[in-house]
């Protein structure tokens, strides 16, 4: 089957090639490399990551297609029951759960030591490494923490290598650790087993509620989605695996160019093009400087900061709906359209459950210290390096994202309700404001001092779905398509 070939390509070719490139340059000492070799390493690692991203895109595509088929089927075959594909795509083994389990073990070591517990609970997270270095027990714990970062610290805050990785900036991990020490939530594996039991029971109950035709199609689509969905997170875990090494090479080169007078800060090197870096290296080789490159880097840095204030619309023009011929393709959108005022924001229901709590609005990693344990995390979007914040959150709301976004997958594994793709959550919600997140229907209610019962009364029903012809007819068509695809699948497997 083509899907199997994509898996083999990712697992046996793309991933090993990427990791081999990253390991080869990781073994090189940046301080001893010539300037030209540092630039060559940066370029090779960036290209290797780009090639790996193509393999990731294949894994994402097959997960997204099978998820969309399951989600659309549930909408048509069980209208009004608020069934979402995310309810059935939970509890699978993943690097996210592995990382949380290891971090919980580290937190357990702290809880088991009076000395460490006192240090961790009384020291601000940014100062923890320095405080722990002052004791033998603390140093031993830091050694274990370093091994944790060696395995998981490559995770990125965004796809731009100008941003530090988790290994470069471990603040969110330390914040999560403090929360785990002060407010233990139990064994992540036990929570995962409970999620699996709930998921499987819901699948059995849902299958029983359908007639034979719908039951067959539900099981077919569920099998595809559950087979391909978990591969997405495994593939994405390695995105940015070369970034820590690339950054070390770049910062060493940047340091040399600062010494040579061509740059003002090490990080300026990230804002130069390849030809400009080559020119700076050539100038340094003959004892000259290129101060014009420092000005160029400063202007580009300022432009990058200015662009952070922009909010991209879901589609252009904004009132356009994604369509392919006669087919509505809005299932692929990553933002819902919401009115600029009103008490309810609509988004995508991606992780089931319902919770009300104050919000912590976190716009970037610079705001991580403002995350309050026991609140609902509200942000533009999340990437793997944001994962440690989930252990402190009771729910998740984002501006951008859908059922297969990183945040939705992690929220389901943490068992917290999530509504993604509201478009305007970070501008409509303020930190400390009470909100109600309904991950079953995809709404976020701004409570404004009202209690949850009042909010439930004024919270709207799920948005009605548009049906161009009866649901039974749609399900029949789905069954025909499913039969054709199943036959194609069997042919591929025999070939």
Predicted regions and their residues:
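Hydrophobic single-pass membrane-insertion segments
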Residues: 260, 490-495
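Mature hydrolase/peptidase catalytic cores and their serpin-fold inhibitory cores, especially
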Residues: 317-374, 378-379, 384-387, 396-397
């Amino acid at each position: 089957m083509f899907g199997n070939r994509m898996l083999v390509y990712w697992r046996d070719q793309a991933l090993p090639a990427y990791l081999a490139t990253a390991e080869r340059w990781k073994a090189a000492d940046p301080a001893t490399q010539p300037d030209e070799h540092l630039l060559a390493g940066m370029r090779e690692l960036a290209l290797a990551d780009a090639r790996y991203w193509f393999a990731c895109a294949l894994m994402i595509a097959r997960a997204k297609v099978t998820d969309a088929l399951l989600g659309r089927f549930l909408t048509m075959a069980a209208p009004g029951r608020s069934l979402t594909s995310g309810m059935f795509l939970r509890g699978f083994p993943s690097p996210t759960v592995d990382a949380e389990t290891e971090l919980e073990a580290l937190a357990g070591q702290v809880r088991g030591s009076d000395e460490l517990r006192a240090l961790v609970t009384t020291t601000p997270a940014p100062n923890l490494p320095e405080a722990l270095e002052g004791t033998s027990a603390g140093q031993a714990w830091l050694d274990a923490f370093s091994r944790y970062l060696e395995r998981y610290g490559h995770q990125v805050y965004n796809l731009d290598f100008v941003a530090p990785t988790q290994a470069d900036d471990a603040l969110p991990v330390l914040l999560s650790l403090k929360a785990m020490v002060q407010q233990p939530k139990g064994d992540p594996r036990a929570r995962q087993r409970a999620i699996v039991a709930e998921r499987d029971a819901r699948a059995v109950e849902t299958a029983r509620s359908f007639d034979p035709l719908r039951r067959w199609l539900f099981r077919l689509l569920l099998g595809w989605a559950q087979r391909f969905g978990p591969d997405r997170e495994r593939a994405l875990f390695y995105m940015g695996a070369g970034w820590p090494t690339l950054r070390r090479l770049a910062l060493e080169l940047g340091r040399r160019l600062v010494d040579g007078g061509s740059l003002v800060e090490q990080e300026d090197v990230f804002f130069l093009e390849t030809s400009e870096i080559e020119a700076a290296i050539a100038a340094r080789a003959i004892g000259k400087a290129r101060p014009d490159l420092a000005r160029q880097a400063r202007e580009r840095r300022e432009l990058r900061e200015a662009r952070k204030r922009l909010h991209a619309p879901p589609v252009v023009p904004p009132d356009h709906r994604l369509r392919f011929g006669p087919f509505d393709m809005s299932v692929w959108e990553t933002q819902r359209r919401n009115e600029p005022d009103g008490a309810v924001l609509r988004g995508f229901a991606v992780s089931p459950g319902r919770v009300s709590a104050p919000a912590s609005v976190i716009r970037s990693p610079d705001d991580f210290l403002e995350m309050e344990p026991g609140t609902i995390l509200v942000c533009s979007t999340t990437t793997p390096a944001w994962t440690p914040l989930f252990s402190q959150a009771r729910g998740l709301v984002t501006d951008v994202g859908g059922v297969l976004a990183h945040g939705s997958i992690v929220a389901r594994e943490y068992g917290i309700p999530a509504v993604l793709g509201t478009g305007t959550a970070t501008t409509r919600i303020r930190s400390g404001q009470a909100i109600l997140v309904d991950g079953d229907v995809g709404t976020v209610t701004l409570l404004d001092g009202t209690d949850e019962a009042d909010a439930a009364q004024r919270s709207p029903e799920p948005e009605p779905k548009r049906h161009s012809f009866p649901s039974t007819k749609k399900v029949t068509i789905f069954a025909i398509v499913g039969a054709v695809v199943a036959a194609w699948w069997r042919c591929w497997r025999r070939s």
